[in-house]
Amino acid sequence: MTDTAENQTPNDRQAGHPRSIRSFVLRQSHMTAAQQRAIDTLWDSFGIDYQATPVDLDANFGSNRPKILEIGFGMGTATAEIALRLPETDFLAIDVHGPGVGNLLKLINENHLENIRVMRHDAVEVVENMLQDGSLDGIHIFFPDPWHKKRHHKRRLIQAPFIAKLLPKLKTGGYIHLATDWEEYAQQMLEVLSSFDSLQNTATDYAPTPDYRPETKFEARGKRLGHGVWDLVFKRIR
């Protein structure tokens, strides 16, 4: 299923690069007038269209500040808050859902944020084709879809092959920060990250929530359901 044409960013209609298994499902979602207006008026300033060739992030941001990749930002509320808390850091935020893209662009405008750029595309393809090796200082993946049913676990984003694609993009000394409210997925995340010799856990197992990460709607929902929340922060050591 794909989003309707009026919910698309200018680059959405291009031919994709098919993969056999995706970690997301595109759902028909309602785009508010304000979200669509934000896309129409702000995309040229804060959006980055997908291309199958490497991109110069410093040129796109107009700065050489540290660069953080955020994969899956939902409605963008936490992303905007983190960018406010870390004004000397640039954030490349990627998601596939139109209303969230529009909402984050609206928040960028409302909060006068200059340190966020937005992409609406499959993050795996962006990592594979657009990001240069050693271009990232950090990677945030907060509350990715846990795909609860066992037969769907193959759709989970955090698996060794994807981490292997991410690692070359991360500078030595850079970090990967994951968070989930699904305990079994947290265990899988811990096992996957621990399997890489080039990554070192900053905690014994799960890390305290860093000060920069605000509570997301997914976290609040999980707490209401009685779930715990697990943060993992691993540093690239070589």
From Swiss-Prot:
The gene is trmB. Keywords: Methyltransferase, S-adenosyl-L-methionine, Transferase, tRNA processing. Substrate binds at residues 149, 181, 216-219. The keyword Membrane does not apply. Gene3D superfamilies: Vaccinia Virus protein VP39. InterPro entries: SAM-dependent_MTases_sf (IPR029063), tRNA_(Gua-N-7)_MeTrfase_Trmb (IPR003358), tRNA_methyltr_TrmB_bact (IPR055361). PANTHER family: 3-DEOXY-D-MANNO-OCTULOSONIC-ACID TRANSFERASE/TRNA GUANINE-N 7 - -METHYLTRANSFERASE (PTHR23417), PENTACOTRIPEPTIDE-REPEAT REGION OF PRORP DOMAIN-CONTAINING PROTEIN (PTHR23417:SF14). One of its GO terms (cellular component) is tRNA methyltransferase complex. It holds the Pfam family Methyltransf_4. Residues 1-20 are annotated as: Disordered. Pathway: tRNA modification; N(7)-methylguanine-tRNA biosynthesis. S-adenosyl-L-methionine binds at residues 70, 95, 122, 145. Residues 1-12 have a biased composition (Polar residues). The active site is at 145. Belongs to the class I-like SAM-binding methyltransferase superfamily. TrmB family. It comes from the Bacteria. This is tRNA (guanine-N(7)-)-methyltransferase. Transmembrane segments: none annotated. Its EC number is 2.1.1.33. It comes from Neisseria meningitidis serogroup C (strain 053442). Catalyzes the formation of N(7)-methylguanine at position 46 (m7G46) in tRNA. GO terms for molecular function: tRNA (guanine(46)-N7)-methyltransferase activity. It catalyses: guanosine(46) in tRNA + S-adenosyl-L-methionine = N(7)-methylguanosine(46) in tRNA + S-adenosyl-L-homocysteine.
